[in-house]
Design a protein with these regions (language model features):
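SAM cofactor-binding core of SAM-dependent methyltransferases
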Residues: 3-78, 87, 91-97, 117-120, ...
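Conserved proline-anchored active-site loop of SAM-dependent methyltransferases
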Residues: 4-18, 27-32, 180, 184-203, ...
Length: 329
C-alpha cells in the first residue's frame, strides 16, 4: 500500500499521520473548514511553502486589531473569545482575503490556494488556543476558560514534505464522488463517517464561518451559521445512513486499483456491527477490530440549558470504536 484515501477527513489528523509515514494521501471533506485543513496538512508540502508562509505570518502578526463580524458574533453576542482576540482575528482574516484577491500569495493559482489554506489554518489554530470551550463549538463555557485570557499567537502549521509516491491532494466533494475518484487512484480507502444525529458542521461552525468569510445569519446562544440548521445529510438520520454508506462503499469498489477498505464506526451509532459486515462481506474477507474509547467530550459534559446549567445526568463515559477491514476478493 502506497496511496490511501480518507473520505471523511474532518480535522485531517488521519491524513496528516498517513502522509507523515510516507503515504500519498487523497483527503476529502465537503465542509469548507475541513477542506482547508486538508489542503494545509495533506496537499501542501513543507519544501514548497514553509518559507513563504512564515514571511506572511510575520507580517500578519503585526496587524492592529479591527473589530468586525467575528468580534460582534462570537465575542459580544456570544462569549467564545475575548473581544481583544476577536478583533485580531477580524483584522488578520481580512488581510488574508485581501492578499489572496490581490494575487500577493503567488502567481500559480494552485500554490496560492495552498498558501492561503496554511495562513487560514494558522489563524484557526491560534483562535482555538484562546477559546472558551471544551473543544467543540456547540457551546461556550459559563465562566471564562483561563486560556481565553492569553494573546492570540500565529504559528506555522506542522507542514510535511511530499510523499515519495507523489503529491497528495485535498478534495471538497461529497463522499460518494470522492470515492469514485479514489477507486482507481489509491490502494486503501478509510471511511470514518458521521454515525449519529450530531453534525460536524455544528461542532466546528466558527471555523466554517472563519474560512468562508461570508458573515452568515446566525442563530441561538452559540450563534451557529444558519446552514447548520438547513444543511441535511443522510448520514445524520437513522433512515438515511445505511443506503448512504452502502453507496460510498460501492463507489470506492468501482475501480480496479483499490484493494482494501477500512471503515470506522461507533457502537453508539445508528448502524450495528452486523449491518456493516453485511455491506462489506460480499466483496471479500472482513476482519473486525474493537477498541475502547472515552466518549466524545459533549457526552461527558452532559446537556446544559441556555443559562449554562446542567440538566439531566451523564450516562456511560466510554464507548467502542469498531474497525472493519475489508480485503477485497
Amino acid at each position: 500500500v502506497t496511496a490511501v484515501a480518507d473520505l471523511f477527513a474532518g480535522t485531517s489528523r488521519v491524513g496528516h499521520a498517513l502522509k507523515s509515514r510516507g503515504y500519498r494521501v487523497l483527503s476529502n471533506d465537503h465542509n469548507a473548514y475541513a477542506h482547508t485543513l486538508a489542503t494545509c496538512y495533506v496537499q501542501a508540502d513543507h519544501e514548497v511553502h514553509a518559507a513563504d508562509a512564515e514571511r506572511h505570518l510575520a507580517e500578519l502578526r503585526l496587524l492592529p486589531p479591527a473589530a468586525g463580524y467575528f468580534t460582534r458574533t462570537f465575542c459580544q453576542e456570544a462569549r467564545f473569545f475575548q473581544p481583544e482576540n476577536g478583533a485580531r482575528v477580524d483584522a488578520i482574516r481580512a488581510e488574508i482575503a485581501r492578499r489572496a484577491a490581490a494575487g500577493e500569495l503567488g502567481d500559480d493559482p494552485a500554490r496560492a490556494a495552498e498558501l492561503e489554506a496554511i495562513l487560514l489554518v494558522s489563524l484557526m489554530e491560534a483562535a482555538d488556543r484562546v477559546d472558551s470551550t471544551t473543544g467543540v463549538q456547540m457551546a461556550y463555557l459559563k465562566a471564562w476558560a483561563p486560556r481565553a485570557a492569553r494573546d492570540l499567537e500565529l504559528r506555522l502549521p506542522a507542514l510535511l514534505p511530499a510523499a515519495p509516491d507523489g503529491k497528495s491532494r485535498a478534495l471538497g466533494l461529497e463522499a460518494v464522488e470522492a470515492a469514485r475518484q479514489a477507486a482507481d487512484e489509491v490502494d486503501l480507502a478509510y471511511l470514518d463517517p458521521p454515525y449519529n444525529q450530531h453534525k460536524y458542521l455544528g461542532n466546528y461552525h466558527i471555523w466554517e464561518t472563519l474560512v468562508r468569510n461570508d458573515e452568515p445569519e446566525a442563530y441561538g446562544v452559540a450563534r451557529k451559521r444558519i446552514d447548520c440548521r438547513e444543511r441535511k445529510s443522510p448520514f445524520n438520520s437513522k433512515g438515511g445512513i445505511a443506503p448512504a454508506l452502502a453507496e460510498v462503499i460501492e463507489a470506492a469498489l468501482s475501480g480496479e486499483r483499490l484493494r482494501y477498505l477500512l471503515v470506522s464506526f461507533s457502537d453508539e451509532g445508528f448502524l450495528d456491527r452486523a449491518t456493516i459486515e453485511a455491506m462489506l462481506s460480499p466483496h471479500g474477507e472482513v476482519e473486525v477490530i474493537s477498541r475502547d474509547h472515552p466518549r466524545y467530550v459533549g457526552a461527558r459534559i452532559g446537556i446544559h440549558n441556555p443559562a449554562g446549567e446542567r440538566v439531566g445526568t451523564v450516562g456511560k463515559l466510554r464507548n467502542k470504536e469498531l474497525l472493519f477491514l475489508l480485503r477485497r476478493k
